[in-house]
Amino acid sequence: MVAMPERYDVVVIGAGHAGCEAARACARIGLRTAMVTMNLDLIAQMSCNPAIGGIAKGHLVREIDALGGVMGEVADSVGIQFRLLNTSRGPAVWSPRAQMDKKLYRFRMREVLEAEPNLRIKQAEVAALTFDAVRRVNGVLLRDGRTIPAGAVIVTTGTFLNGLAHVGEMTYSCGRNGEAPSQLLGDQLRSMGLNWTRLKTGTPPRLDGRSIDWSSFEPQAGDAEPTPFSFLTGRIERQQIQCHIGYTTDETRRVLQEAIPRSPLYSGQIEGVGPRYCPSIEDKFVKFPDKVRHQIFLEPEGLDTHEVYVNGMSTSMPTDVQVAMVASIPGLEQAEMIRPGYAIEYDAIDPRELNHTLEVKSIPGLYLAGQINGTSGYEEAGIQGLIAGLNAAMSLGGSDPVIIGRTEGYAGILVDDLITKGADEPYRMFTSRAEFRLHLRIDNADARLTPLGRRAGLATDERWELFQRKERQKLRLTQAFETHKNGQLLKRPEVSISDFLPWIVEVLGEAPCRGLLETVSTEAKYGGYIQQQERQMARMKDSERRAIPHGFEYRGIPGLSREIQDKLDKVRPGTLGQAGRVPGVTPAAIAVLDCYLSLHIGPN
């Protein structure tokens, strides 16, 4: 007798940053979840830089944490240098960043995942998705012939779909350097009638720290008082390290310019579009010929390794050129290259094939998250994995979907940008993408999103109790400032809320929750601007409440040009607000559409 395959509620394909969040979310909510990866030892591998967070990216990590995700907690537990960025500017753009011990990050993430009773992690290659008679996903087929039936499948394959690496003139198929690509699944997905593209990313060489003259570089220390990512973290206790700053030279320029004909980026060998905001070092010298030098950062990859990541020197140049390029930098003349840099091309879907839940519009039960959707970055991948996991769980449980609006979080901005505008190049989050960034701060991510995580069943009792305590303290302290002379003093730019700490402890009767003082201070000093943004957000929410019916026909609407009809028909926006964000759709066209909806569909 042939044994029946074990059935799961959800199968997650891939165990990168998106896959880990998706799998853990589904399992934590109570779904039987299988996460399938081609290498169990590389769960949550940091394929590129050994860091979490950064400008806007730190906001995403806080939002992952506020919802009940895992990235922030793991990062806090293995971080080896923490810095709060942009502190010379306003609190809207403050953002935490931390260097990670890459090996410990993998180990800790695997430990967290294996502690989930509803989650099973399997080492295998998924060769294909399986479908029922009405083209709904109902599981996966493994390369060894086994099947795993499931109610939903979340694909988080990163750069593995038909991945092709480039080092100079040399090319080879891989998902990451030294790892096999996912060609069978990639070929099946490309045959399913969806729109795909090729994107490209790259990574720099790694050096042996013992061969570096560290005295030639400027040391960069972390903050004396580290800022954690997770609202659950008290203090960062782990040993902290230094990074170092250096610069390219005229010799670096000469080496690269002479080798440009050998660059796969400029020879036509690489066809995929690379990230605009993280260009390769050769691209920097070509596109910015007047810039005298470019900054690099030497970042240790861990506490028990000599391997050093050269941030700012991503390249796909031939290995001999990379050796000469490294040696052209003061302090690296004798540096030994452990691993060369390389570029990798991979398949990515046009994210306009998805809806706000990250489910493929035309294939029920199939969700996509991470680099497969055209994004770059661990943090962008992590939040997508969490959203896909939450929505797969909600769908299987018959609950309403989890939709985060543009006024509620950077998570909502990321998803809305992807499914409305597409991704012609790897998408990276910036604070400038937010209409209301003073409202979307790192200190209030819990106030914005923890109630949503609680309703979805993801936020734990511990997180919920801490959040409620902070909200009670905030109400009490805000009222106290409003009725005391200290309230007027606090509004002054030069006055710090920490000056009132003894009085605050007296008012609260206990020590304030972490982050509370930052929130109260910001809302006092920027109250007028925040109120103005709240009025603007209310208007945006009104436009989001004007729903456009599923399958709505744009053809034949008087006053809408054929071009705009085509754009709207391709994206299929769900609301009038989303329609207004479709590239090329004018305010006049939105007014016409609003009028037509009112006349023919009725008031919202």
UniProtKB/Swiss-Prot annotation:
It comes from the Bacteria. NAD(+) binds at residues 274-288. Keywords: Cytoplasm, FAD, Flavoprotein, NAD, tRNA processing. GO terms for biological process: tRNA methylation; tRNA wobble uridine modification. InterPro entries: FAD/NAD-bd_sf, GIDA_C_N, MnmG, MnmG-rel, MnmG-rel_CS, MnmG_C, MnmG_C_subdom, MnmG_C_subdom_sf. It is found in: Cytoplasm. FAD binds at G14, A15, G16, H17, A18, G19, V126, S182, Q371. Its cofactor is FAD. One of its GO terms (cellular component) is cytosol. One of its GO terms (molecular function) is flavin adenine dinucleotide binding. Belongs to the MnmG family. Homodimer. Heterotetramer of two MnmE and two MnmG subunits. NAD-binding protein involved in the addition of a carboxymethylaminomethyl (cmnm) group at the wobble position (U34) of certain tRNAs, forming tRNA-cmnm(5)s(2)U34. NCBIfam families: mnmG_gidA. PANTHER family: GLUCOSE INHIBITED DIVISION PROTEIN A, PROTEIN MTO1 HOMOLOG, MITOCHONDRIAL. This is tRNA uridine 5-carboxymethylaminomethyl modification enzyme MnmG. The lineage of its organism: Bacteria, Pseudomonadati, Acidobacteriota, Terriglobia, Bryobacterales. The gene is mnmG.
